[in-house]
Swiss-Prot record:
Disruption phenotype: Eliminates TAFC production and increases FsC production about 10-fold. Does not affect the production of FC. Pathway: Siderophore biosynthesis. Keywords: Lyase, Transferase. This is FsC-acetyl coenzyme A-N(2)-transacetylase. Its EC number is 2.3.1.-. It is an enzyme of class 2 (transferase). One of its GO terms (molecular function) is lyase activity. It comes from Aspergillus fumigatus (strain ATCC MYA-4609 / CBS 101355 / FGSC A1100 / Af293). FsC-acetyl coenzyme A-N(2)-transacetylase; part of the siderophore biosynthetic pathway. Aspergillus fumigatus produces 4 types of siderophores, low-molecular-mass iron chelators, including excreted fusarinine C (FsC) and triacetylfusarinine C (TAFC) for iron uptake and intacellular ferricrocin (FC) for hyphal and hydroxyferricrocin (HFC) for conidial iron distribution and storage. TAFC consists of 3 N(2)-acetyl-N(5)-anhydromevalonyl-N(5)-hydroxyornithine residues cyclically linked by ester bonds; FC is a cyclic hexapeptide with the structure Gly-Ser-Gly-(N(5)-acetyl-N(5)-hydroxyornithine)x3. Induction: Expression is induced during iron starvation. Pfam families: Acetyltransf_3. Gene3D superfamilies: 3.40.630.30.
Amino acid sequence: MTIKAQPTLHTARLELVPLGHEHREFTMKLDMDPEVMKMVAFGRPFTEDEAIQVHTWLMNCATSVPGFGTWVGFAEGEFVGWWVLAPVPTTENPKSFRTDRTEYGFRVSPKFWGQGYAKEGAREMVRYAFEELGLAEVIGETMTINMASRAVMAGCGLTHVETFFNKYDTPPPGIEEGEVRYSITREEWLRMQKPSMTRSRWFPAFASWLPRLLLSRLWSYIFQGRRLAAGAASP
């Protein structure tokens, strides 16, 4: 499979554009927002220097494995958030990356919380990873108590596969309950697509002949009713 440069992606409401230097203000604003960061990393907003480092890392994801990278999402021209397909280091060498597996993540502006944008962008990441990149697995991680992020992963078809515990110099509140890893394989994702694909094939035809069938039955009943009424009125 030939992997082209990181493409612009689209969903029903989002235009997902490859992250560029011109988007640094957007990513930094999210990373320095206390509400956004309370269940991420240190559990506190990043400093300006830390936010710059995160933006640099997000940019570098596009050079790690062909097709991977970060996308910034816009709805009707307004910045919504970012989504990333990040590289997963190999067990043999942390400086080399697996080409069949990715870890996805996202941040969404609080203005757009509760409107389905996080899941909409995440589903497109999963679709792109399997359908266009041909990857074998997509994983995601978050704090155990971060139920919103867990709901997004579950909504994309990922299932909980592991709870783990890391040690942090400055542990965020709630980290004592651990972190969770979710996963979905390409085969699992493909099985999820088959029912919807089947429905999309038969529904248009079904929708076209169902009204005709009902109308035919209705006319038959009316006609039969008239005959019975006429027979009852006959001497």
